[in-house]
Amino acid sequence: MSYNIVLMTAPNKEEAVKIVRTMLEERLIACANIMDPVSSFFWWQGKIGEEKEVLVIMKSHETLFKKLSKRVIELHSYDTPEILALPIVNGSPSYLDWMKACLEPVK
């Protein structure tokens, strides 16, 4: 079983919570952490930008990433939301078993 940590930023905590709750209700993530605020620096429309944002760290299964990503894009207010998946290389067996039980059935 291959699990991912999915990183996403949002403009504010309210939007982050809305997206996280939807992901949980649809069983696309097992859990999430919201870090508020973070300072983000980026290129946008030819200029360097800086914003206070909210960082969301979600735990999921790699086979759910396409659904998760599509759903985040539907719910997110940004034109180009950050949605990045990093593989979980290892974890405690009991935690990974708990994650498996929380997620929609994966193949």
Specify the residue positions occupied by each region the protein language model found.
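Positively charged, small/polar-rich N-terminal and surface patches that mediate targeting and assembly
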Residues: 1-107
